[in-house]
Amino acid sequence: MQNIFLAATLLGAAFAAPQNPPTSCSAAPQPTGTGSPGTVCGSTTFTNYTVKAGDTLGAIAKQYNSGVCDIAKVNGIDNPDYIKPDQVLSIPANCVTPDNTSCVKPAPVITNTCVLGVGSTYTVKSGDSFSAIATSFNITLASLEARNPQIPNYDLIFPGQVINTPLCPNSVCDSIGTYVIESGDIFYNLAQSNNVTVGQLESLNVNVNVTDIHPGDIIILPHNCHNITASA
């Protein structure tokens, strides 16, 4: 009987003891860039969001009533056009004054009419347009259209269709090899650091989803494609 009384006493004490307050699910995550709730776009809370394949900052900002540039600022994103699957973003939600313009650089004027070194064909993906493909190769739309007279309507292309891209004569790449994707890699950065275009990478990696690459994936990567200097 004494043991039963002692057990009941201990059980009651356990229930009466003060407990640590539960962690709030709405607590703001620590931003990886700059800013804090109340200082970015008038937001009072941050929400964590894990990027999925096909996501854009514009769509994410709209979903959370945020601003593209506000999200970019908080997460230290230099180029708001490029995010990658599984990237975790801190989103300043319900912005009072969303910023969608200050971080957006004006589109460069493209004057190139051919592609350097490699990438003579391109396989159309879902959502592609002739204009977007030309931009990905850093060539003019007119030059891409001129290379594909077999297509009756440039506004009507379909996934899997192979189109031609104009290659520059007397141009080469220093090397074309394989590369193992590392954490943090995206096609845009790989193209920039190897002096090629995203379109060229897509051309050489038809079966790779450029918005959904993972560490350990192997891609074909050209390096430093350029015009050949005429011999003296």
From Swiss-Prot:
Q: Where is the LysM domain?
A: 47-91, 120-165, 177-221
A Pfam family of the record is: LysM
Question: Where is the signal peptide, in residue numbers?
Answer: 1-16
Is the Repeat keyword given for this protein?
yes
Q: Cite any additional comment in the entry.
A: In plants, chitin acts as a microbe-associated molecular pattern (MAMP) that is recognized by lysin motif (LysM)-containing plant cell surface-localized pattern recognition receptors (PRRs) that activate a plethora of downstream immune responses.
Q: In which family does this protein belong, per the annotation?
A: Belongs to the secreted LysM effector family.
Q: What is this protein called?
A: Secreted LysM effector Mg3LysM
